[in-house]
Design a protein with these regions (language model features):
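Cytosolic regulatory regions of ion transport systems
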Residues: 1-143
């Protein structure tokens, strides 16, 4: 596994999963000038990144410690885990907190029942359906 070179390790954000949500987050963070690295098991997924994406990409299985270490997870400021699989997301969040002490971990979950698996870890959970509903309510002026 080859680590990216020339990466500024200070204030780095790592995104795990380059599906629709991960690519959107990575593209927006890149546009904001964030120091960014994104990991996905499929190189084809990176085609969703914009042409002006300024971060780094790593192809690999995110549950593999060697892949996580090649993404400099030990020194990242924040980790955003947004694969389409709750089980993988919970596992990577647990690894990030318990093994690497990542200070800010954000995890996408589809099933609210899985949130209990992260209880006590200090992980912030993202529920896309709830966010969509909240935005919908704001649009229609509901309180």
């Amino acid at each position: 596994m080859k680590k990216p070179t020339g990466l500024n390790l200070k204030n780095k954000t790592v995104v795990i999963g380059c599906g629709q949500l991960g690519a959107t987050i990575a593209n927006k963070f890149s546009k904001e000038g964030k120091n960014l690295l994104i990991v996905d098991e499929s190189e084809k997924s990176f085609e969703q990144l914009s042409e002006d994406f300024s971060g780094y990409t790593i192809v690999g299985e995110c549950t593999d410690l060697e892949v996580l270490e090649s993404a400099y997870i030990k020194s990242c400021k924040e980790l955003v885990i947004v694969t389409g699989d709750d089980s993988i997301n919970v596992l990577v969040a647990t690894i990030a907190k318990k093994i690497y002490n990542v200070p800010n971990v954000y995890v996408r979950l589809s099933d609210p029942d899985n949130e209990i698996l992260l209880k006590g870890l200090g992980v912030k959970v993202i529920f896309p359906l709830e966010l969509s509903f909240d935005k919908f309510n704001l649009m229609r002026g509901a309180k």
